[in-house]
Curated annotation (Swiss-Prot):
Its EC number is 6.3.2.6. It is an enzyme of class 6 (ligase). Belongs to the SAICAR synthetase family. Keywords: ATP-binding, Ligase, Nucleotide-binding, Purine biosynthesis. This is Phosphoribosylaminoimidazole-succinocarboxamide synthase. Pathway: Purine metabolism; IMP biosynthesis via de novo pathway; 5-amino-1-(5-phospho-D-ribosyl)imidazole-4-carboxamide from 5-amino-1-(5-phospho-D-ribosyl)imidazole-4-carboxylate: step 1/2. One of its GO terms (biological process) is cobalamin biosynthetic process. It catalyses: 5-amino-1-(5-phospho-D-ribosyl)imidazole-4-carboxylate + L-aspartate + ATP = (2S)-2-[5-amino-1-(5-phospho-beta-D-ribosyl)imidazole-4-carboxamido]succinate + ADP + phosphate + 2 H(+). The lineage of its organism: Bacteria, Pseudomonadati, Campylobacterota, Epsilonproteobacteria, Campylobacterales. GO terms for molecular function: ATP binding; phosphoribosylaminoimidazolesuccinocarboxamide synthase activity. Transmembrane segments: none annotated.
Length: 236
């Protein structure tokens, strides 16, 4: 497969065309961003860690019936993925209250929620990725119909039901995570983007030590060490 011109560059990845019009190469970057890219940094090797972590998680999800865009991983930082039309919604699944949820609703940080909360944000950096509801999704034509909203929520909850016990077995608490979904040329909804410490909050099961991008957001240090620890636990 031939890697051709760059199609898109985001905060954490670059997408390249290939000689197959239905496939792209996704390259993971070492860049770190927070607060809608107002805070920026770089951690050598982070891209490779996220690529490995996301590959392992996507394979786990596929074995459990979740369709993804991943075709194969071809280098330390590169994946071949199906070309998708990304649904312009960030889907957030929360198991424990922290971050923006505590600020918006006054819930005490660390509160275990009675059930997984699924939230939507509009994918629009200029607007600050605002929170939106089902009706917004329909009014803005972000989805095809109400049935697709239900499909998105059901997929998000199923992913959570697979990952929460998996990570618990690795002595990690899956606090919350963000996913992006895409539509293939056959209009099939698939998990796209990545699942990694860039897009998840992981706390150690016993100490509640943060092992994710919050270490960068909150200037806790040892970002790479935390990502390495997550990968180590996934592989063990």
């Amino acid at each position: 497969m031939t890697k051709k011109e760059m199609l898109y560059e985001g905060k954490g990845k670059k997408l390249f065309k290939t000689d197959d019009e239905n496939l792209l190469i996704s390259e993971f970057k070492d860049d770190l961003t927070a607060f809608n890219a107002e805070k920026r940094g770089n951690e050598s090797g982070k891209g490779a860690l996220n690529c490995k972590i996301s590959t392992e998680i996507f394979h786990l999800l596929e074995k459990n019936g979740i369709k993804t865009h991943l075709v194969e991983t071809i280098s330390d930082t590169e994946q071949v993925v199906k070309k998708c039309k990304i649904v312009p919604i960030e889907v957030i699944v929360r198991n424990v209250a922290t971050g923006s949820l505590t600020k918006r609703l006054g819930i005490k940080d660390g509160t275990v929620l009675p059930f997984a909360l699924v939230e939507f944000c509009l994918k629009d950096d200029a607007l600050g990725d605002p929170f939106i509801n089902d009706e917004h999704c329909l009014i803005l034509n972000l989805v095809q119909n109400e049935a697709q909203i239900s499909e998105i929520k059901n997929m998000a909850r199923k992913i959570n039901s697979i990952l929460t016990p998996f990570f618990d077995n690795k002595n990690l608490r899956l606090i919350d995570f963000k996913i992006e979904l895409g539509l293939t040329k056959d209009n099939e909804l698939v998990l796209a983007d990545e699942i990694s410490p860039d897009s998840c909050r992981f706390w150690d099961k016993f100490s509640n030590e943060k092992l994710d991008k919050d270490r960068f957001r909150q200037d806790l240090g040892n970002v790479k060490m935390a990502y390495e620890e997550v990968l180590k636990r996934i592989l063990n």
